[in-house]
């Protein structure tokens, strides 16, 4: 897995505060400042660690919201989203709709990785605020579905018998 991070620095912003915002979420990121002609500049970087992001999502109890955002931004082998700079500056995760001012994050799966598995690791589903094992949940749901189908067949068979009984009584 590789995480690509980009954040534009507007003329009204302190470039080192923007850098701090990124490092508060991705402390192991290697960042480079790139001067731009029409803008003040942009921080670009990469990391392989999402541990701090995972920790913040759990401590802020926003795993389900994070999961929704990660799934919404998912492509074949990646997911992308924006983080609010001001929130990141104070060490908090807040997903940003503003694509022009936020911190752009793209998480790329390696060839032998599944992006959905990475998303499940970063933001597992919860029930009542408690992380649930999705694999067990999926097995349970499949079992329940199978039982419902069996019950449905029984009802269909009973219905057929009733129809036959009613027609023979004439």
Swiss-Prot record:
InterPro entries: PAB1135-like, Ribosomal_uL5_dom_sf. Residues 149-163 have a biased composition (Basic and acidic residues). Residues 133-170 are annotated as: Disordered. Signal peptide: none annotated. Disulfide bonds: none annotated. Residues 133-148 have a biased composition (Acidic residues). PANTHER family: UPF0201 PROTEIN TK1335. HAMAP family: UPF0201. Belongs to the UPF0201 family. This is UPF0201 protein MJ1564.
């Amino acid at each position: 897995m590789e995480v690509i991070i980009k954040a534009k620095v507007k003329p009204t912003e302190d470039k080192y505060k923007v850098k701090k915002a990124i490092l508060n979420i991705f402390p192991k990121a290697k960042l480079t400042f790139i001067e731009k002609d029409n803008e003040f500049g942009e921080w670009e970087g990469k990391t392989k660690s999402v541990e701090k992001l995972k920790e913040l999502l759990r401590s802020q109890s926003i795993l389900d919201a994070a999961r929704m955002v990660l799934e919404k931004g998912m492509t074949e082998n990646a997911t992308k989203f924006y983080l609010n700079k001001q929130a990141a500056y104070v060490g908090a995760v807040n997903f940003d709709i503003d694509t022009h001012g936020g911190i752009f994050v793209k998480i790329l799966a390696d060839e032998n990785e599944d992006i959905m598995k990475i998303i499940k690791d970063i933001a597992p589903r919860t029930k009542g605020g408690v992380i649930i094992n999705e694999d067990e949940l999926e097995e349970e749901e499949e079992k329940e579905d199978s039982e419902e189908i069996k019950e449905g067949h029984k009802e269909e068979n009973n219905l057929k018998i009733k129809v036959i009984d009613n027609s023979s009584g004439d």
